[in-house]
Amino acid sequence: MYDWFSEMRKKDPVYYDGNIWQVFSYRYTKEVLNNFSKFSSDLTGYHERLEDLRNGKIRFDIPTRYTMLTSDPPLHDELRSMSADIFSPQKLQTLETFIRETTRSLLDSIDPREDDIVKKLAVPLPIIVISKILGLPIEDKEKFKEWSDLVAFRLGKPGEIFELGKKYLELIGYVKDHLNSGTEVVSRVVNSNLSDIEKLGYIILLLIAGNETTTNLISNSVIDFTRFNLWQRIREENLYLKAIEEALRYSPPVMRTVRKTKERVKLGDQTIEEGEYVRVWIASANRDEEVFHDGEKFIPDRNPNPHLSFGSGIHLCLGAPLARLEARIAIEEFSKRFRHIEILDTEKVPNEVLNGYKRLVVRLKSNE
């Protein structure tokens, strides 16, 4: 795929494939992400659907349609402001000890002879942390993972659609049951002027949005640092922060995203009509040689590193500071405990949007 990205950046950085516009270069990807006045994140007719729901024209809808990810200003700004402070440096500082202790406990459960570190570390860590932030029972983490996969992948054969619908209703019911027993941020949402479905969507987004991406960031970092034999250098030169940023660039947890044009738009040499869908390839933009010297090469101390893996503009990922903190602590503690990592088996996430591993089986030797 990356060979195709490289070819398209040179030949057709903005390309129409007969169905959807595709963007490959850093310059135009960033332009689409930043220009919310021309490129909308509302891909589902958010406002129209919400109005129909309130008027009773729609009896049931999926709450995750109604979030800051799928809205434009001014509603987007209102939604984002309600939880911005929980990801502030001051708030995250209070979580560092909890994250480190949780990471050490999870590492204790790993069998160094052979074990799956996606299952034992990369999956549970972000779920446990967001559960604490929201005041939800940590013992329900297995349910959170199942629901997270459901919302992230939205996969299913025709015969499985009914079962998927039942699981989605379970998720909605769970969030409803805990709306009045959460922490300050949950109370803030409950007491806001949002509609009931917006409140549900908001809490569901906070609960699961960062799980898959943080899991992918941790597992991708382990893969990249092992593949390029970088663990010793990262330890000795204390390159954890820069190396994780490079893993974000080189192996982004999210490969692409989509916007919809609000008006006729000129992008590069192409003219895109109003109402067209535009797919921007973050994974391609992150290796654009016009921005990243030796973009196809993994450089653990790369600086500067203006990758787009957490987005750009008003939709820059709200939870990015938390994801970075979790990944840094996970990699630090993992690296301190194990000096040799042998990858035995892997299984990729079956999804062209998310980039990560369902399984990452390793053999480890401790530093003792």
Curated annotation (Swiss-Prot):
The protein's enzyme class: oxidoreductase
pH dependence, record text: Optimum pH is 8.5 for peroxidase activity.
Coiled-coil features, chain-numbered ranges: none
Alphabetical list of CDD domains matching this protein: P450_EryK-like
Entry cofactors: heme
Effect noted on mutating T214A: 2.7-fold increase in styrene epoxidation activity. No effect on thermostability
Temperature and thermostability: Optimum temperature is about 75 degrees Celsius. Activity is 10-fold greater at 75 degrees Celsius than that measured at 25 degrees Celsius. Thermostable up to 85 degrees Celsius. Thermal denaturation midpoint (Tm) is 91 degrees Celsius.
Enzyme Commission number(s) from the entry: 1.14.-.-, 1.11.1.7
Effect of D77R: 1.4-fold reduction in styrene epoxidation activity. 13-fold increase in lauric acid hydroxylation activity
Residues binding heme: H76, R80, T257, R259, H315, C317
UniProt keyword annotation of Heme present: yes
MF GO annotations: heme binding; iron ion binding; lactoperoxidase activity; monooxygenase activity; oxidoreductase activity, acting on paired donors, with incorporation or reduction of molecular oxygen
Catalytic function, reaction form: 2 a phenolic donor + H2O2 = 2 a phenolic radical donor + 2 H2O
Impact noted for substituting T213W: 19-fold reduction in styrene epoxidation activity. No effect on thermostability
Co-factor binding details: Binds 1 heme group per subunit.
GO CC field: cytoplasm
Record keywords: Cytoplasm, Heme, Iron, Metal-binding, Monooxygenase, Oxidoreductase, Peroxidase
Function field: The endogenous substrate is not known. In vitro, catalyzes the H(2)O(2)-dependent epoxidation of styrene, cis-beta-methylstyrene, and cis-stilbene with retention of stereochemistry. Is able to use cumene hydroperoxide (CHP) or tert-butyl hydroperoxide (TBHP) instead of H(2)O(2) as the electron acceptor. Can also hydroxylate fatty acids such as lauric acid.
NCBIfam families: Cyp119_Thmprot
Family stated for the protein in its record: Belongs to the cytochrome P450 family.
Name of protein: Cytochrome P450 119
